[in-house]
Amino acid sequence: MEPQLAEFVLKEEMTCQCPKMSDGAYDMDVDQNYFEEEVRLASFANFPSSYPVSAPALARAGFYYTGDGDRVKCFSCLAMVEGWQHGDTAIGKHRKISPNCKFINGFNNLRSDCILTQVPVMQNGFQNSAEDLAERSSSEIMADYLLRTGRVVDMSTPKYPRHMEMCSEEARLQTFQNWPAYSPLTPKELANAGLFYTGINDQVKCFCCGGKLMNWEPSDKAWTEHKKHFPECYFVLGRDVGNVATEANTHGGRRRGSELACPAMNDYNARLETFSSWSFPIDKETLAKAGFYSIGDGDATKCFHCGGVLNCWSATDDPWEEHAKAYPGCKFLIDEKGQHFINHAQLKRPILHKANSADASPALPKDSNLLKSPLVTDAQQMGFPLEEIKKVMGQKLKTTGKNYTCVEEFVSDLCAQKETVLEKPKEIEISLEEKLRQLEEEKICKVCMDRRISIVFIPCGHLVACAVCADVLDKCPICCTIVERRQKIFMS
């Protein structure tokens, strides 16, 4: 099997057409004074708190405050927006009024502290020639320096995925109608690995990165070859690029982050209407803003996007914070509040929402029945004690009224519980920033020291490697136990 190299691509500077812009012409250059999110956020010092969209959400969406009413301006496309209404989201509004804005188009995959640049984009390892570099202006050279030092992110790379029409695994599978019979790999395996058939010999292409592969051999594995030749592919790295797996590959119904749990509750007013008979101490409007709607069972609420359920609310609870503690991966939450907010909320764990009383936990099944569960068997094979398993299952039932349905979520909560137990209460107070740094270091792969840990080795149960490194390890780097199986988990 051989990779097909992509060609050199030079991206042109974007043009932005916004239906709701300030009068008159504007400079196409970005406002470099506000390309850092912290600077944009500082501009909202006098922003009225009564407005329906929060300052952090606006700053994260690329806006800074103009000082006039609720009017904000994008540092990148220079679009101005005002007249914010309940139910508006900063990112959604930005995309609607300025669909060509480079910053907002790259929002899902890139950092927010960026500026627009017009630099050549290299694909699959191609380098600039000396002639290309000699012709570049001083501003382009400065932009390249900023990119290399990590201060900004190049927004000129094309939006992922490259082939939106092939996001569905079923759609990719349909392209293999004339797949050559001599190929040793099945269409199902290739489609599952993000590849679709180009119609040329045995050549396939990734819907996300656009990488091409051909000349397959009997010993080849679709996922392995995809990772080997295109290791930077966002789909291979496990990022949410909109892939829609077939029902057989959804791992017990686990939903991708780009899909809504309840599309009918996408609108703020629709969520607010569900609280018509609400009599509990927490403000229903605040709950609706945080993405929750009432499910009609006491004070139980559910997020329209991630499907997370929270109950037992008190008057002092912050719905946004509780959302971040319990369901940090919710894309609506990330878009609205930002990763910094979520990280700080996570430091205030326990993640699980407060119950009304200590004895409010539903009874667990007896040990004999509990041990029959495949989830419990897998967890015990990873080295988790039965007492910890019972405790985490009880907390899950207390919080949601339901038990675990997929091993990834179960193992993730078990790991979080283990970290909490191992904490030393006598440690000296550490600043939030230091705790955050330590938390990030704990989640880094101990092999490459770059990507995040995501694979549990079985049977030893050690969680120390990312998906890329774990794929090439036959023995656990901690205890040298031979790896019989690898289980991917999703860390909160």
UniProtKB/Swiss-Prot annotation:
The ranges of the BIR repeats are: 40-105, 172-237, 271-334
Q: What post-translational events are described? A: Degraded in a 2-step mechanism; a caspase-independent first step and a caspase-dependent second step. Stabilized indirectly by MAPK, which acts to delay caspase activation, rather than directly phosphorylating xiap.
What is this enzyme's catalytic activity, as reactions?
Answer: S-ubiquitinyl-[E2 ubiquitin-conjugating enzyme]-L-cysteine + [acceptor protein]-L-lysine = [E2 ubiquitin-conjugating enzyme]-L-cysteine + N(6)-ubiquitinyl-[acceptor protein]-L-lysine
Record-annotated membrane-spanning stretches: none
Q: Is the keyword Phosphoprotein assigned to this protein? A: no
Annotated SUPFAM superfamilies: Inhibitor of apoptosis (IAP) repeat
Name the family. Answer: Belongs to the IAP family.
State the protein's name. Answer: E3 ubiquitin-protein ligase XIAP
